[in-house]
Structure formats: structure tokens, C-alpha cells
């Protein structure tokens, strides 16, 4: 006769425990309600009820697969609580409820991989306890109106500004990447991320309000910032024959950018042939600086 081992399982219809002799070929159906089976590996040597492996709410083996379609409304809220899941659990788990951190992502292994809470429209305090990494900011499912994820502040996940708010964005301390790719730029305020040391040398020009008379007067960026609508090249058909500045060296007007900028020699193009008073006499072209008001040579 084949050797046997002991397996223990619980029954939904009885509080008693059943002890069965299990053959080597494991396993006979030991319970009337397979989904309630709880394997007891400490009491069973080689026999684990097969039905428990496929159980959607098997508490002792709550892996990412158990957190998916099997985790229905009938599944208890404690499902997935003991999971030490991989990052995939954090993004694809349907256990994400309306106003809470996905339970499977509460473990240490998942927090650093962007387990962002799902915001609900009615709760104003949701998402405030997130401690995820910067990677969460780009793909965050948090709605801007709901809250500002705490973990994302250093990487430019700035809350949406209201039109009547003058102090919005004041707490941002983001990296230079936020200045160019931020989808938050609105007319209500200057993104504070462009005032930090990281952003100043990388041309983070603040977004100005249309009604503001001091448009772009405060940036402290590099000359490359001035290649915008603030710059006005001179006319090529002027009788005084001002050289036309190329876009790479656009001279700013007095109301914008840095008033001390001057036209470099590489800006100058040959004078227009339409001009009656200007005809280049040599290879050294006349260059008139719009910023300083003085002639120079290219």
C-alpha cells in the first residue's frame, strides 16, 4: 500500500477540522468548498490541495495573479495584503479602489516603483500619503484637482493653478526637465521650478499672462531663451541698412529678456541690395547693433 501523509483543510460548512490520509498521487478532493481551502504546509509533507492553488482568494498564496480578475467584490478586502508583489502589481492590479493606496502596493518592494493612489473626485485628501519615486509623475493617474502627490513635488508634478490664485506653484522644487515638458504651464503664475539653481541656466522662461504688462522681464536665463516672440529683427529694406539678425542670435527688445544683450558678429547678414545708401564695399560688412545703438564690424 502506498505511503500516506496528512493534509488539513477547513470547511465552509463546518468549524471542525478534517484529517485525511493522502495517497502518493495527491490529491483527493478534501473539501466540499474548494475556495475555502487553506493549505497547511507545516502539517502536510507532500500533499497540498490542488483546489487551493487556483483559488482566487487564497490568503496564504496571494500573488499578483490572485489580485487580478479573480479578486472580485466577493473577495475580502484583506486579499493581497500579504503580497510582496513586483512593480507590475502596482500598475495593473484591479484591487485599486477609489480612494486608497492599492493594498498590494503597501509592501516595501512596491513603494519605490510608483504605486500612486487613485484619486476620487469627492475626497480632497486622497493621494497625500504617497511615497513613490519620481517615475510616478509622468504616468500618474491622480487628477490635478484632487491633490498634489507628495512624492512628485520634487519632479514637477505641480497642481493645477486656479485663475484667482496668486500663490500657486510656490512650493515646487523640480528639476530642469520640468521646465520644457511640463503640461502645467498656465497664465496664472510663474512656475517656481524655473527660479531654482537647476533651471536658471537651462532657459526656463516663465509663462506670462496676456494681461501682464511686465511680460518676460524677470527671466535670468541664457541667451538661447531670447529666440522667442520677444525678439524683433530689423528690416532688410531700411534706408539705414540695419543687418538682419538670425534667429540664433536674436536681439531682444527693451521690454523683454535681458536689456544688456548685444548683437554678435555672427548675427549679421549682408545688407540688402534694395537699400540705396548701403552697398558693401568689402568683405567686412557693416553691422549695426540694435541693443547698443553703435556701429561695429562683423
UniProtKB/Swiss-Prot annotation:
The keyword Repeat applies. Pfam families: Keratin_B2_2. Residues 26-271 are annotated as: 25 X 5 AA repeats of C-C-X(3). It comes from the Eukaryota. Sequence repeats lie at residues 26-30, 36-40, 57-61, 79-83, 89-93, 99-103, 104-108, 109-113, 114-118, 119-123, 126-130, 136-140, 146-150, 151-155, 156-160, 168-172, 178-182, 188-192, 193-197, 203-207, 225-229, 230-234, 249-253, 256-260, 267-271. GO terms for cellular component: cytosol; keratin filament. InterPro entries: KAP. Keywords: Keratin, Repeat. The keyword Repeat applies. Restricted to a narrow region of the hair fiber cuticle, lying approximately 20 cell layers above the apex of the dermal papilla of the hair root; not detected in any other tissues. Belongs to the KRTAP type 10 family. Interacts with hair keratins. In the hair cortex, hair keratin intermediate filaments are embedded in an interfilamentous matrix, consisting of hair keratin-associated proteins (KRTAP), which are essential for the formation of a rigid and resistant hair shaft through their extensive disulfide bond cross-linking with abundant cysteine residues of hair keratins. The matrix proteins include the high-sulfur and high-glycine-tyrosine keratins. PANTHER family: KERATIN ASSOCIATED PROTEIN, KERATIN-ASSOCIATED PROTEIN 10-1. This is Keratin-associated protein 10-11. It comes from Homo sapiens (Human). The gene is KRTAP10-11.
Amino acid at each position: 500500500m502506498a505511503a500516506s501523509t496528512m493534509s488539513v483543510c477547513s470547511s465552509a460548512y463546518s468549524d471542525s477540522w478534517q484529517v485525511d490520509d493522502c495517497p502518493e498521487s495527491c490529491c483527493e478532493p478534501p473539501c466540499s468548498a474548494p475556495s475555502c481551502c487553506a493549505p497547511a504546509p507545516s502539517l502536510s509533507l507532500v500533499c497540498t490541495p490542488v483546489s487551493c492553488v487556483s483559488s482566487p482568494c487564497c490568503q496564504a498564496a496571494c500573488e499578483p495573479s490572485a489580485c487580478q480578475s479573480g479578486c472580485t467584490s466577493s473577495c475580502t478586502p484583506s486579499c493581497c495584503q500579504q503580497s510582496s508583489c513586483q512593480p507590475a502589481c502596482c500598475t495593473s492590479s484591479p484591487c485599486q479602489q477609489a480612494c486608497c493606496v492599492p493594498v498590494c502596493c503597501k509592501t516595501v518592494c512596491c513603494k519605490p516603483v510608483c504605486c500612486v493612489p487613485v484619486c476620487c473626485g469627492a475626497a480632497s485628501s486622497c493621494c497625500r500619503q504617497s511615497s513613490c519615486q519620481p517615475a510616478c509623475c509622468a504616468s500618474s493617474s491622480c487628477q490635478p484637482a484632487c491633490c498634489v502627490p507628495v512624492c512628485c513635488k520634487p519632479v514637477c508634478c505641480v497642481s493645477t493653478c486656479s485663475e484667482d490664485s496668486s500663490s500657486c506653484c510656490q512650493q515646487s522644487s523640480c528639476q530642469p526637465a520640468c521646465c520644457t515638458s511640463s503640461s502645467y504651464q498656465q497664465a496664472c503664475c510663474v512656475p517656481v521650478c524655473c527660479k531654482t539653481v537647476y533651471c536658471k541656466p537651462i532657459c526656463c522662461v516663465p509663462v506670462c499672462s496676456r494681461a501682464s504688462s511686465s511680460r518676460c522681464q524677470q527671466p535670468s536665463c541664457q541667451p538661447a531663451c531670447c529666440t522667442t516672440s520677444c525678439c524683433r529683427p530689423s528690416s532688410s529694406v531700411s534706408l539705414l541698412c540695419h543687418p538682419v539678425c538670425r534667429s540664433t542670435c536674436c536681439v531682444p527688445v527693451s521690454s523683454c529678456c535681458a536689456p544688456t544683450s548685444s548683437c554678435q558678429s555672427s548675427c549679421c547678414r549682408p545688407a540688402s541690395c534694395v537699400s540705396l545708401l548701403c552697398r558693401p564695399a568689402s568683405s567686412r560688412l557693416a553691422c549695426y547693433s540694435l541693443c547698443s545703438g553703435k556701429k561695429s564690424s562683423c
